[in-house]
Protein backbone atom coordinates (compact mmCIF):
# COMPACT_ATOMS: atom_id res chain seq x y z
CA UNK A 1 0.00 0.00 0.00
CA UNK A 2 1.41 3.38 -1.05
CA UNK A 3 1.65 6.20 1.46
CA UNK A 4 0.69 9.34 -0.49
CA UNK A 5 1.93 12.61 0.95
CA UNK A 6 -0.49 15.48 1.36
CA UNK A 7 1.20 18.61 0.01
CA UNK A 8 -0.20 22.11 0.40
CA UNK A 9 -0.27 24.03 -2.92
CA UNK A 10 1.95 27.07 -2.55
CA UNK A 11 3.42 29.90 -4.58
CA UNK A 12 6.86 31.46 -4.00
CA UNK A 13 8.53 34.58 -5.37
CA UNK A 14 12.14 35.47 -5.98
CA UNK A 15 11.85 39.25 -5.92
CA UNK A 16 14.49 41.29 -7.72
CA UNK A 17 15.03 44.95 -6.86
CA UNK A 18 13.68 47.62 -9.19
CA UNK A 19 17.25 48.28 -10.38
CA UNK A 20 17.26 44.93 -12.24
CA UNK A 21 18.73 44.22 -14.85
CA UNK A 22 21.43 46.82 -14.13
CA UNK A 23 21.99 45.36 -10.67
CA UNK A 24 20.89 41.88 -9.58
CA UNK A 25 19.86 42.09 -5.93
CA UNK A 26 17.35 39.62 -4.49
CA UNK A 27 14.88 40.24 -1.66
CA UNK A 28 15.16 37.92 1.32
CA UNK A 29 13.37 38.28 4.64
CA UNK A 30 13.87 36.95 8.16
CA UNK A 31 10.90 35.10 9.61
CA UNK A 32 9.54 36.61 12.81
CA UNK A 33 8.39 33.25 14.22
CA UNK A 34 11.64 31.28 13.77
CA UNK A 35 15.18 31.95 14.86
CA UNK A 36 17.43 33.26 12.07
CA UNK A 37 15.42 31.75 9.20
CA UNK A 38 15.64 33.80 6.00
CA UNK A 39 13.38 33.02 3.08
CA UNK A 40 11.60 34.25 -0.04
CA UNK A 41 7.97 35.39 0.16
CA UNK A 42 5.61 32.46 -0.25
CA UNK A 43 2.18 31.26 0.72
CA UNK A 44 -0.71 28.93 0.12
CA UNK A 45 -2.93 28.96 -2.92
CA UNK A 46 -6.57 29.26 -1.91
CA UNK A 47 -9.17 26.89 -3.35
CA UNK A 48 -10.30 28.21 -6.73
CA UNK A 49 -7.52 30.81 -6.86
CA UNK A 50 -5.19 30.99 -9.85
CA UNK A 51 -1.46 30.62 -9.22
CA UNK A 52 -0.74 34.17 -10.43
CA UNK A 53 -3.52 35.68 -8.30
CA UNK A 54 -2.06 33.82 -5.30
CA UNK A 55 1.38 35.23 -6.14
CA UNK A 56 0.14 38.82 -6.13
CA UNK A 57 -2.00 38.30 -3.01
CA UNK A 58 0.85 36.72 -1.06
CA UNK A 59 3.27 39.48 -2.02
CA UNK A 60 0.77 42.11 -0.86
CA UNK A 61 0.18 40.22 2.42
CA UNK A 62 3.84 39.54 3.19
CA UNK A 63 5.84 42.46 1.79
CA UNK A 64 3.15 45.12 1.51
CA UNK A 65 3.18 45.44 -2.27
CA UNK A 66 2.08 43.53 -5.32
CA UNK A 67 3.67 46.07 -7.66
CA UNK A 68 5.87 43.60 -9.51
CA UNK A 69 6.29 42.36 -13.02
CA UNK A 70 6.73 38.66 -13.70
CA UNK A 71 10.00 37.95 -15.49
CA UNK A 72 9.92 34.15 -15.53
CA UNK A 73 8.27 31.08 -14.04
CA UNK A 74 10.02 27.89 -12.96
CA UNK A 75 8.66 25.17 -15.30
CA UNK A 76 7.85 22.56 -12.63
CA UNK A 77 6.19 22.31 -9.25
CA UNK A 78 8.72 21.55 -6.50
CA UNK A 79 7.85 19.81 -3.25
CA UNK A 80 9.41 19.55 0.17
CA UNK A 81 8.46 17.89 3.45
CA UNK A 82 8.02 19.90 6.62
CA UNK A 83 10.61 19.22 9.32
CA UNK A 84 9.31 17.26 12.30
CA UNK A 85 9.27 20.35 14.54
CA UNK A 86 6.62 22.11 12.42
CA UNK A 87 4.68 19.23 10.84
CA UNK A 88 2.07 19.22 13.66
CA UNK A 89 1.49 22.96 13.24
CA UNK A 90 0.82 22.46 9.52
CA UNK A 91 -1.51 19.44 9.87
CA UNK A 92 -3.06 17.94 7.71
CA UNK A 93 -0.18 18.72 5.34
CA UNK A 94 3.09 16.79 5.16
CA UNK A 95 4.82 19.52 3.18
CA UNK A 96 4.29 21.94 0.34
CA UNK A 97 4.34 21.79 -3.43
CA UNK A 98 5.46 25.11 -4.84
CA UNK A 99 5.39 27.09 -8.05
CA UNK A 100 8.24 29.61 -8.23
CA UNK A 101 8.19 32.95 -10.01
CA UNK A 102 11.00 35.40 -10.70
CA UNK A 103 9.61 38.93 -10.37
CA UNK A 104 10.98 42.47 -10.43
CA UNK A 105 9.75 45.27 -8.21
CA UNK A 106 8.29 48.08 -10.29
CA UNK A 107 9.98 51.47 -9.99
CA UNK A 108 8.48 53.33 -7.06
CA UNK A 109 7.17 50.19 -5.33
CA UNK A 110 7.78 50.22 -1.59
CA UNK A 111 8.44 47.20 0.62
CA UNK A 112 6.59 47.22 3.95
CA UNK A 113 6.95 44.12 6.12
CA UNK A 114 4.87 45.72 8.91
CA UNK A 115 1.71 44.24 7.45
CA UNK A 116 -1.59 43.28 9.11
CA UNK A 117 -0.17 39.84 10.04
CA UNK A 118 3.63 40.28 9.86
CA UNK A 119 5.62 37.19 8.93
CA UNK A 120 9.00 38.93 8.73
CA UNK A 121 10.93 41.22 11.07
CA UNK A 122 13.82 42.13 8.78
CA UNK A 123 14.73 42.06 5.11
CA UNK A 124 17.63 42.74 2.76
CA UNK A 125 18.39 42.87 -0.93
CA UNK A 126 21.43 40.66 -1.46
CA UNK A 127 23.50 38.95 -4.15
CA UNK A 128 22.96 35.36 -5.25
CA UNK A 129 26.12 34.36 -3.36
CA UNK A 130 24.77 35.94 -0.17
CA UNK A 131 21.45 34.08 -0.58
CA UNK A 132 23.30 30.76 -0.51
CA UNK A 133 25.23 31.87 2.60
CA UNK A 134 22.06 32.97 4.44
CA UNK A 135 19.84 29.98 3.71
CA UNK A 136 20.45 27.24 6.25
CA UNK A 137 17.16 25.41 6.41
CA UNK A 138 15.16 22.61 4.83
CA UNK A 139 14.32 24.61 1.67
CA UNK A 140 17.96 25.24 0.71
CA UNK A 141 18.09 22.54 -2.00
CA UNK A 142 15.00 23.97 -3.68
CA UNK A 143 16.37 27.52 -3.50
CA UNK A 144 19.63 26.39 -5.10
CA UNK A 145 17.77 24.49 -7.85
CA UNK A 146 15.47 27.40 -8.72
CA UNK A 147 18.17 30.08 -8.65
CA UNK A 148 20.54 27.94 -10.74
CA UNK A 149 17.74 27.45 -13.30
CA UNK A 150 17.12 31.21 -13.56
CA UNK A 151 20.89 31.78 -13.83
CA UNK A 152 21.24 29.19 -16.61
CA UNK A 153 18.36 30.83 -18.50
CA UNK A 154 20.18 34.18 -18.25
CA UNK A 155 17.66 35.95 -16.03
CA UNK A 156 19.98 36.44 -13.05
Curated annotation (Swiss-Prot):
Domain Nudix hydrolase: 6-148
UniProt cross-references to CDD domains, sorted A to Z: NUDIX_Ap4A_hydrolase_plant_like
KW Thylakoid (keyword) present: no
PROSITE patterns, sorted: NUDIX, NUDIX_BOX
Protein EC: 3.6.1.-
Record's keyword annotation contains rRNA processing: no
Any one GO molecular function term: pyrophosphatase activity
Sequence motif Nudix box, location on chain: 43-64
Functional description taken from the UniProt entry: Accelerates the degradation of transcripts by removing pyrophosphate from the 5'-end of triphosphorylated RNA, leading to a more labile monophosphorylated state that can stimulate subsequent ribonuclease cleavage.
Family, similarity comment: Belongs to the Nudix hydrolase family. RppH subfamily.
Database matches in PANTHER family: ADP-RIBOSE PYROPHOSPHATASE (PTHR43736), DIHYDRONEOPTERIN TRIPHOSPHATE DIPHOSPHATASE (PTHR43736:SF1)
Protein name: RNA pyrophosphohydrolase
Lineage: Bacteria, Pseudomonadati, Campylobacterota, Epsilonproteobacteria, Campylobacterales
